[in-house]
């Protein structure tokens, strides 16, 4: 029997309101080690509030959050922050150092690591994120995709078990988006718990699990193919269905005796609805 994966983070009946407006309502879910999870929903659905709760910027008003089975004490969030790293939509807000190398070293220096250990970690994470070619450059002068890779390298250097990507691909061109999405999948395969808060509905097709938020509630969760077969339910909240999953569902509904012309027409019809 394979060993059971541990829940890296769990929300248990969590609630949070702002000015009496409920932003999160009795939210319960778990994300496991080695799992890549996408959280989707419209603006105001509660996605970003989840991110703020996970990073200790907000404190639940009800319920509890557990990290590796330990209930988070929001009066002392050091345990929480030691286990979680976050990459934001605009990495410029995260840069501290004059050079890429300085920026990655900053968090390590705060942990009082030796220079030798810091150099070894920087060498490892810059190679992994393909940022080793410009570690002496100023991060603000890099392209959008390069900046995000530097932000990822800075997070990886601290070796958190849980990595949150908060709309991290929203400002990137298609090529850079693809690179960052590949990192997410790769990190999960390496055993990290990867949580992506996203509006990119094609990204979710690569996820192990999808959480769909609406008005502070978790309305669906499961594998992408399970979640997005309920098209009518998701269309009620005007959530786009990933084209590839919509196409897959429609093709499965076509009998094996159908001719190719009809199949092509069905595909073309779906494409026009994008």
UniProtKB/Swiss-Prot annotation:
Keywords linked to the UniProt accession: ATP-binding, Cell membrane, Membrane, Nucleotide-binding, Translocase, Transport
Assigned GO CC terms: ATP-binding cassette (ABC) transporter complex
Membrane topology: Peripheral membrane protein
GO terms assigned for molecular function: ATP binding; ATP hydrolysis activity; ATPase-coupled transmembrane transporter activity
SMART domains referenced in this protein's UniProt entry, alphabetically: AAA (SM00382)
Binding site residues for ATP: 41-48
Top-level taxon of origin: Bacteria
InterPro entries cross-referenced by the UniProt entry: AAA+_ATPase, ABC_transporter-like_ATP-bd, ABC_transporter-like_CS, ABC_transpr_CbiO/EcfA_su, ECF_ABC_transporter_ATP-bd, EcfA_1, P-loop_NTPase
Protein localization: Cell membrane
Limits of the ABC transporter domain: 9-240
One Pfam match: ABC_tran
PROSITE patterns reported for this sequence: ABC_TRANSPORTER_1, ABC_TRANSPORTER_2, CBIO
Keyword Cell membrane: yes
Subcellular location, principal: membrane
Gene3D superfamilies for this protein: P-loop containing nucleotide triphosphate hydrolases
EC number: 7.-.-.-
Family per record: Belongs to the ABC transporter superfamily. Energy-coupling factor EcfA family.
Function: ATP-binding (A) component of a common energy-coupling factor (ECF) ABC-transporter complex. Unlike classic ABC transporters this ECF transporter provides the energy necessary to transport a number of different substrates.
Assembly behavior: Forms a stable energy-coupling factor (ECF) transporter complex composed of 2 membrane-embedded substrate-binding proteins (S component), 2 ATP-binding proteins (A component) and 2 transmembrane proteins (T component).
Protein name from the UniProt record: Energy-coupling factor transporter ATP-binding protein EcfA1
Organism from which the protein derives: Mycoplasma genitalium (strain ATCC 33530 / DSM 19775 / NCTC 10195 / G37)
Lineage start: Bacteria, Bacillati, Mycoplasmatota, Mycoplasmoidales, Mycoplasmoidaceae
